[in-house]
A protein has these predicted regions:
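A membrane-periplasm/extracellular boundary helix in multi-pass inner-membrane enzymes
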Residues: 84, 179-257, 272-276
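N-terminal hydrophobic segments of proteins, predominantly signal-anchor/transmembrane helices
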Residues: 1-46, 366-368
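Long extracytoplasmic/lumenal interhelical loops at the membrane interface
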Residues: 102, 254-331
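Membrane-interface micro-motifs in multi-pass membrane enzymes
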Residues: 36, 100-103, 111-128, 319-323, ...
Length: 399
């Protein structure tokens, strides 16, 4: 019913919408909206596929399949990461970055981050973080998974993604507290993933790498901070580009959270946008909300550099980078409330089950939901996999 509502609102709004596509849009309005709806169809297909696999394999085998995919992605990402340190060929990269023009990895005086085969380091972390609880569920049965779990955790740490690290720590802590209160018994194994993450952070310190500065003769035309690596915009920029992984991740968290939620730049931008717009009851439709947001985003993020107005993502369709805000503008208060009620019922059911498997799937889901505050705006493959695994838990019950 929820996905049907999203689809209906989008189709109704699309019929009466007069599209004004950004300059660098790569598809027509019809194609763009169709892709949004196809994404919903793909989301349903993944849930169905995971559930259908249970007709051929037991639950733990399905989780092993998913975890092995995560291990493989992690290993490939680490190979890519070390290619810049030990100077061997990285994988071919032919897709644009978030800025739209190139995927910048090797930049003078910038710290090396683990991209893997993704467009952004945070995309890699968002994809891997939900798999960590599944790995440690398997580790309760076979100790070898403790060792294998180091690979995705190290890959996340070297991505230096605050979204991945914060969501993983808070998600597991939240689930651990709830299960401790419910069972009146603290299980140390529940927080082992956090211990592994902290350990990997210190290991990652020895694997940090900063690209060397350019020759001084190249500045100008290049900016001074590319020829002198001791120049930083502020303390946050200094922490971000520190070779120390611990400083890069955890000091940045401290500096950002001092400013409250508005310390996260994207949330600050979204707060300003919400305050400008009328209350959304039924929403603007999937994709259409992004088209409406893009001009305002340009206005909110433009900068005056030496008397010239510079836009962050000129001529592009901009992402909300927040699922909940995207749902609010795409499907209105009605759609957002339906989604939150659905999630609450799922989490409540897992909590009431209270068993070991429910804990790890609960953690998996909470990690995903936390990441949606800071990264990604669409119903993702990992969320579909998580819901599919939950259906296996509820297979003989009415969800």
């Amino acid at each position: 019913m929820l996905l049907l509502y999203f689809t209906s609102v989008t189709l109704i709004r699309a019929v009466s919408y007069s599209p004004d596509l950004p300059e660098f849009a790569t598809s027509s309005f019809t194609q763009y909206i169709s892709l949004r709806l196809l994404k919903l169809l793909g989301f349903i297909a993944v849930i169905w596929f995971v559930y259908t696999l249970s007709n051929y394999f037991d639950r733990d085998t399905i989780i092993k399949f998913i975890s092995f995919i995560g291990i493989t992605v992690s290993l490939l990402s680490l190979i890519s990461y070390f290619s810049y340190i030990f100077d061997f060929q990285d994988f071919s990269r032919n897709r644009p970055g978030s800025g739209g023009w190139s995927q910048p990895i090797k930049r003078a005086c910038s710290i090396l981050r683990n991209y893997g085969t993704f467009r952004e380091p945070s995309f890699l972390a968002v994809w891997l973080a939900p798999i960590i609880p599944l790995n440690f569920y398997l580790a309760r049965k076979r100790a070898i998974w403790y060792g294998l779990s180091i690979l995705p955790i190290l890959a996340i740490i070297l991505s230096r993604s605050l979204t991945g690290v914060i969501s993983l720590i808070l998600g597991i802590l939240f689930a651990s507290v709830l299960w401790t209160l419910k069972n009146k018994n603290f299980d140390l194994l529940f927080i082992i993933p956090i211990i592994f993450l902290l350990f990997s952070s210190f290991v990652g310190n020895s694997l940090g790498y900063k690209f060397p500065a350019l020759d001084p003769s190249m500045c100008p035309p290049e900016s001074p901070d590319k020829c002198n690596c001791s120049i930083y915009d502020d303390k946050l920029d200094e922490a971000k580009n520190s070779e120390s992984v611990v400083k890069s991740v955890f000091e940045r968290i401290t500096l950002i959270t001092r400013g409250g939620l508005d310390g996260f730049e994207n949330i600050s931008i979204l707060n300003q946008y919400i305050s400008r717009e009328n209350i959304q009851i039924f929403g603007q439709g999937l994709g259409i909300a992004n088209l409406n947001f893009s001009p305002t985003f340009d206005d909110l993020t433009k900068k005056n550099v030496d008397g010239e107005i510079v836009y962050r993502n000129p001529g592009q369709i901009v992402s909300f980078n927040n699922l909940y805000i995207n749902l609010y503008f795409s499907s209105g208060i009605v759609g957002l409330l339906l989604f939150l009620i659905f999630l609450f019922n799922i989490l409540k059911k897992l909590y009431n089950n209270g068993n070991e498997y429910s804990f790890y799937i609960f953690s998996n889901l909470v990690v995903i939901l936390l990441m949606y505050f800071f990264q990604a705006e669409e119903l993702s493959t990992m969320l579909a996999i998580s819901l599919g695994l939950m259906l296996l838990e509820f297979k003989n019950e009415k969800v």
